[in-house]
Design a protein with these regions (language model features):
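ABC family nucleotide-binding domain
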Residues: 3-205, 209-212
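Conserved beta-strand-loop-alpha-helix hinge in the C-terminal portion
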Residues: 216-234
Length: 234
């Protein structure tokens, strides 16, 4: 197993009445350590199923899922809980912040359950919120709240950062700022970042582009010349 992340013939089925649907249909792909990867495809393509399996929030019915040399698909429920807690940071479309905690307290809350967390205030500073530590979510803009959620994920010091449509609830300008932050985080820390999106324009900023359709991997390509998100229009 030479790759940092690898799906090996992964299948996930759902039963709808008498119909069996393959949300993941023999998926094969890999991502190398430190890459900024974008997984792109239309709604219903299987992107979120893929993310849920890779993030340990769901299990596959067939195949193997590897992260850093370990077969996640063979983990027990207890091992999966440990995996989600320590190894993976999650950023979703909606921020899911605790409303009666400050920005700093939201990040500290996540850091407290981890083995080797980063300093919460320092990480908030890295995402441009050093002057907003004491603000509650209701006092922050959408972009600032998403930055808190990114800081919360990074403070766990995870091996892998998974982002599911992280700009979906943001306006164009703010969305670009958040994507720039994710790209910079990958470059500066060497952390592996995977972003799931339906927006094909964003693939220009990725080191690796994985296309998904109808539960299958259409392509897995390296982008030799990724560009800053500031240069991308959509």
């Amino acid at each position: 197993m030479d790759h940092f992340v690898e799906f090996e013939d992964v299948c996930k089925y759902y039963q709808t009445g008498s119909v069996k649907i393959a949300a993941a249909d023999h998926m094969n792909f890999y991502v190398d350590k430190g890459e900024f990867c974008i997984i792109v495809g239309p709604s219903g393509a299987g992107k979120t199923t893929l993310l849920n399996i890779l993030g340990g929030m769901d299990s596959c019915d067939e195949g193997h899922v590897w992260l850093d040399g370990r077969d996640v698909s063979r983990f027990s429920e207890k091992a999966l809980t440990t995996y989600r807690r320590y190894d993976v940071g999650f950023v979703f479309q909606f921020y899911n912040l605790v409303q009666n905690l400050t920005a700093l307290e939201n990040v500290e809350l996540a850091a407290q359950i981890c083995r080797d967390p980063l300093d919460a205030a320092e990480v908030l500073g890295q995402v441009g919120l050093s002057d907003r530590l004491s603000n509650f979510p209701s006092q922050l803009s959408g972009g600032e709240q998403q930055r808190v959620s990114i800081a919360r994920a990074l403070a766990k010091n995870p091996k892998l950062l998974l982002c599911d449509e992280p700009t979906g609830a943001l306006d164009y300008k703010t969305g670009k700022q958040v994507l720039a932050l994710l790209q910079r985080t990958c470059r500066e820390t060497g952390r592996t970042v995977i972003v799931i999106t339906h927006n094909t324009a964003l693939t220009a900023m990725a080191d690796r582009i994985i296309q998904v359709k109808s539960g299958q991997i259409l392509s897995n390509q390296v982008n030799e010349h990724p560009v800053p998100v500031e240069q991308i229009e959509w």
